[in-house]
């Protein structure tokens, strides 16, 4: 016997659909049946059609209803390392702080770190994220199951490179086999909320065989590849000297046929015009992480990507390179930083670069395209999954609402996000995390993080005279 699906009505709200025409319904409503959107339309119509059969009806009193944000680059297992690598260069960041930290993590550390990160993601409206690569995917899986959100999880994969911790030295075949096992065990689990991708940490830690085999197995399994690409000039210089190409990482990846539509290219800061063209022709998706880029990497050519037709989404990166896992903050920064970049490179201001509506696309439907899930998430449309956030704009931070779409990018704070639904279930309701005891997680994380840093031997400088 078929189980009756609960019917939830969200009405009397401003429905920001992010569909292909970017429809916004001023006095709109969404009907949700089980885990999918059943109907969208004016409040009067939806109430007339469904009010007598609804299991729950929520009057939003003018609040915004939007698709959940898709964070396309986040290291959830780095959340316990928040604050351990501030104000240092990338190589110090990597070799002296992050690798010692990550290489001493246990599966339990990864689980707790992902829970803590997940709380911050949910509070800032994220319903789906792409893990950029960690050591203990089973711990992440356990946490995502509990959090109730959606994820594309990736193992941090390296088969070569200087300075790797001893317990990270794997052969190419071991790297591929471990990821295939993760795929077989966890892909499409947690009611379909978890997908397993293949990871390439960066080209400096990948042999050609790892690149080739990852390319082929991901294509065979119809899944994605998540890779840090063209982060710093040194990376390009190294590729030019070792691979015999005329520019860098992207030119080499084009040469070996890795620039395909299932490649998520994180950061992608140091590209020339030809390489931007390679991304566009290959259907490569870019995850723009403005906060961490400003700290460690530089100005990514976002305007040029968009003009070339490259799909650009947003990511927060990990806590040690950003500290804030908020897509709300990243939206604000994405617009401002790229306006600033335009002035820097051209000597003239151009406030029209990366406008608010473009940023909203980057955070929603472009994010869904980036994680290869746009057939089900990223916009509010009939038949898609019910991944929804409710925003209260009636606070000091957002009032007045002369231009509501602009306000969502330039004025919204995480505190404006009141409720979050993923897969038709509330994961935050009226600012309260539903599936976890948040206070217990925070207390456990403080203790676990301290123990982990001690095991890793990471010593931080004294910035001031503590007494």
Regions found by a protein language model. Name each.
Residues 130-134, 197-213, 294, 370-373:
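Active-site glycine- and acidic-residue-rich loops that bind
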Residues 82-149, 175-191, 446-454:
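Alpha-helical scaffold segments that flank or form the walls of functional sites
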Residues 140-270, 274:
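Metal-coordinating catalytic core of metallo-dependent amide/deamination hydrolases
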Residues 255-262, 303-395, 411:
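His/Asp/Glu-enriched, well-ordered alpha-helical/loop segment
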Residues 1-28, 32-38, 43, 48-50, ...:
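Active-site microenvironment of metallo-dependent hydrolases
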Residues 13, 30, 35, 62, ...:
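Divalent metal-coordination and catalytic microenvironments
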Residues 80-112, 155-173, 232-262, 333-354:
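Active-site gating loops and adjacent loop-to-helix segments of metal-dependent hydrolytic enzymes
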